[in-house]
Amino acid sequence: MNALKGRDILALGFMTFALFVGAGNIIFPPIVGLQSGPHVWLAALGFLITAVGLPVITVIALAKVGGSVDALSHPIGRYAGGLLAAVCYLAVGPLFAIPRTATVSFEVGVVPLLGESGTALFVYSLAYFLLALAISLYPGRLLDTVGRFLAPLKILALAILGVAAFLWPAGPIGTAQPEYTQAAFSQGFVNGYLTMDTLAALVFGIVIVNAIRSRGVQSPRLITRYAIVAGLIAGVGLVLVYVSLFRLGAGSHAIAADASNGAAVLHAYVQHTFGSLGSSFLAGLIALACLVTAVGLTCACAEYFCQRLPLSYRSLVIILAGFSFIVSNLGLTKLIQVSIPVLTAIYPPCIVLVALSFCIGLWHSATRILAPVMLVSLAFGVLDALKAAGLGQDFPQWLLHLPLAEQGLAWLIPSVATLAACSLVDRLLGKPAQVAA
């Protein structure tokens, strides 16, 4: 089979959409919508660039090089590329994404019943990760069965929630918090990092390409074309989900004005609109979705690291589950606070890598361009991260007042300047000399 039928392409698009939509993704648009008030759509535009546009572009970039993040990062060298891949796996694994699945389901399903309690979170997360561990050690056919059952149910629930957000808003749009009044677009842009979908796309891009190849497609041109179509289908789905959740959050000021995270906003709206039965349904759905996501990420991380470390798959599953359990006990709000500086630091070089991968043919040596620009973007990303963590008080004033620094995008101008300088040097040096055998 050399070409996919229409229904196969559509199925590929839905699969890509399902890969991106984890339970954690639905908690960020509501809180941004709530806090941005009348500036909600400007904040949404910034959010959609990093939470939808970049992941879709990343899928396309990976498809052009065969789906592997190692191939995409080849110009920066084997060790730097391996470090980048490891950081992506750790971020979408035990550092943030896996623990977040437990805290999201706890916030939505348990907190409304028992309230905030460290003991309750400890007991819940222990049971949660023991179950995730058991399934990850012996996935068998259980995960496939749950996945086939869960995917349409989750899409249906999101569709109902999205329609309800526009038909039955909880109230009028409230006032914006100061940071959104001053810079709604950039606040949305940086908050889009929290979905971690660009990092996730770097990890599972190979899954999408392999899914195309499994249908008998071998032509690189067709693989790239189908990956682009799948990415666009997923992108449209993500935009619809996010826009409806922004509207939900923006209209929830009357019922969730003091919410500290999106899970609280979401629960308040569902409780207000659908009552206790709807709230229980949402809690059960998100708990199941979170568990499936946790198992999938645990398996993926264990399979990746067992090929690179002298540890067995089973040992790594146990280590990953145990570490995720410990991190999850920070709680959702604290976990998000910790993740913001880290993601602020590592996102810029990933953005640079993906964006410049489309321009490789313009230079004599991609290494001369990518390595310096990524290094500069990382350095200034770390600067933004330190400021986001509240550690920038002692910085020189010129560092605090770089172009776009107030918007958390201090890395952008230096990266563009480095790109221009390196492009000029590359043009002057010409093609690298071939090493004689």
Curated annotation (Swiss-Prot):
It is found in: Cell inner membrane. InterPro entries: Brnchd-chn_aa_trnsp_Livcs. The chain crosses the membrane at residues 9-29, 40-60, 79-99, 120-140, 155-175, 189-209, 226-246, 277-297, 316-336, 342-362, 369-389, 399-419. Its main location: membrane. It is a multi-pass membrane protein. One of its GO terms (molecular function) is L-leucine transmembrane transporter activity. One of its GO terms (biological process) is valine transport. GO terms for cellular component: plasma membrane. Keywords: Amino-acid transport, Cell inner membrane, Cell membrane, Membrane, Transmembrane, Transmembrane helix, Transport. It holds the Pfam family Branch_AA_trans. Belongs to the branched chain amino acid transporter family. Component of the LIV-III transport system for branched-chain amino acids. BraZ is specific for isoleucine and valine. The LIV-III transport system may be H(+)-coupled. This is Branched-chain amino acid transport system 3 carrier protein.
